[in-house]
A protein has these predicted regions:
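Short, low-complexity, intrinsically disordered N-terminal peptides in bacterial proteins
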Residues: 1-7, 134, 183-188
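Glycine-rich phosphate-binding loop signature in dinucleotide/nucleotide-binding domains
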Residues: 3, 45-47, 136-142
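Active-site-proximal alpha-helix that buttresses catalytic centers in soluble enzyme cores
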Residues: 6-72, 99
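Generic beta-sheet signal
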Residues: 8, 140-151
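Short active-site segment of divalent metal-dependent hydrolases/proteases
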Residues: 16, 152-153
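Phosphate-handling substructures
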Residues: 29, 69-128, 170
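Short beta-strand scaffold positions
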Residues: 53-54, 127, 147-148
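Domain-level recognition of soluble alpha/beta enzyme cores
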Residues: 164-188
């Protein structure tokens, strides 16, 4: 461990074989490009003391590989899985515009009050992810790499940067992007 405040790296998974809305209910693997871009994101030489990841294969497989290569412990936390898109899992926005345009529009305009059909609400998602985040509780100077999803990282960034939950979908989190959080802090 280093001296100073705890440091968290939030790494979004890379490109997957999935199409459309790929949330908690879509356990799709990375493409070769997805693997390469994640490795490239970590090529800057950061050293991690432990790795925590979502249970979904697009996060878990690279986390296992990176932890083994670095010789650091790995923890899988179900609470770091992506939002559950319910009936929209695996469906593209274009397909939904043909069959469920009104519901999709309501979700995009007001995701807090309009969840995907049979999916998870943003308030439920927030509660789950915040509980997982707070349990990270890194020690002083500890460096923790969290490999997760766009929704999870958007939520942590929204809390950290003061964005309202209603604007969550507008926060840019590209595939295989690394976001540094220093110092770590718990959220409510």
């Amino acid at each position: 461990m280093s001296v100073g405040p705890a440091r968290i790296g939030l790494l979004r998974h890379g490109e997957t074989t999935g199409q459309g809305f790929c949330g908690r209910g879509s356990d799709v693997p990375l493409t070769e490009t997805g693997w390469t871009t994640m490795r490239d994101a970590l090529a800057g030489g950061s050293v991690w003391d432990r790795i925590v990841c979502s249970p979904l294969i697009r996060c878990r497989a690279p986390a296992q590989a990176f932890a083994e290569e670095a010789g650091v412990p790995l923890a899988v936390d179900d609470r770091l899985a992506e939002l559950d898109f319910g009936d929209w899992e695996g469906r593209t926005a274009a397909a939904l515009m043909e069959t469920d345009a009104d519901a999709l529009g309501r979700f995009w305009q007001d995701p807090v009050n309009h969840s995907p059909p049979k999916g998870e609400s943003l308030l439920e998602f927030r509660e789950r992810v915040v509980a997982g985040w707070n349990d990270l509780a890194p020690e002083e100077g500890e460096r923790v790499l969290v490999i997760a999803h766009g929704g999870v990282i958007r939520l942590i960034r929204a809390l950290r940067e003061g964005w309202p939950l209603e604007k969550l979908l507008g926060i840019d989190v590209p595939l295989a992007s690394l976001h540094i959080v220093e110092p770590w802090q718990p959220y409510r």
